[in-house]
């Protein structure tokens, strides 16, 4: 019975923490993540003109045109899958773009308490990726 109570308490805390984290990031969080993880290649404006762009085998994607290139619809799911590594973008050649989902997971695991459940770590990574996507959506050409 004690194990069931601990399991329910852990699950409840995880859900509450996930809900709080999901509300916390906002645009500022996503912008900071973008500047830290993406701007060196994609540029501050998202046009693919970052300081590292010229050293890549293929130019980075112009992130300001994602919706335009998808019939006016911002492709949230596809962007999520590119960031977390489920989709390899051919323009990146041999995957010059880091698999940020793996990078974020390693960072969270390094900082997280040893007993933190995998579900909580996954939720923290999801929040980080979603904050980044939310910010990228604000870069779309008008």
Residue ranges and their predicted role:
Residues 16-34, 64-72:
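Electrostatic cytochrome c docking/interface patches
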Residues 56-119, 132-136:
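Extracytoplasmic electron-transfer domains, predominantly the class I c-type cytochrome c fold
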Residues 30, 34-44, 97, 132, ...:
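The canonical Cys-X-X-Cys-His
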Residues 47-48:
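Short, non-ligating residues that shape and space the ligands of small metal-coordination modules
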Residues 51-55:
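Short cysteine/histidine-rich zinc-coordinating motifs and their immediately flanking basic loops
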């Amino acid at each position: 019975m004690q194990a069931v109570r601990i399991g329910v308490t852990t699950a409840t805390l995880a859900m509450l923490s996930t809900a709080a984290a999901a509300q916390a990031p906002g645009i500022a969080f996503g912008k900071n993540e973008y500047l830290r993880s993406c701007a060196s290649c994609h540029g501050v404006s998202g046009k693919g003109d970052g300081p590292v762009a010229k050293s890549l085998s293929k130019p980075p994607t112009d992130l300001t045109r994602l919706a335009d290139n998808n019939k006016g619809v911002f492709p949230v799911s596809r962007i999520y899958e590119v960031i977390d590594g489920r989709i390899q973008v051919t323009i990146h050649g041999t995957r010059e773009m880091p698999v940020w989902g793996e990078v974020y997971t390693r960072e969270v695991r390094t900082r997280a308490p040893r007993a933190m459940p995998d579900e909580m770590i996954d939720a923290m990574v999801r929040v980080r990726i979603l904050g980044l996507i939310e910010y990228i959506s604000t870069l779309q050409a008008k």
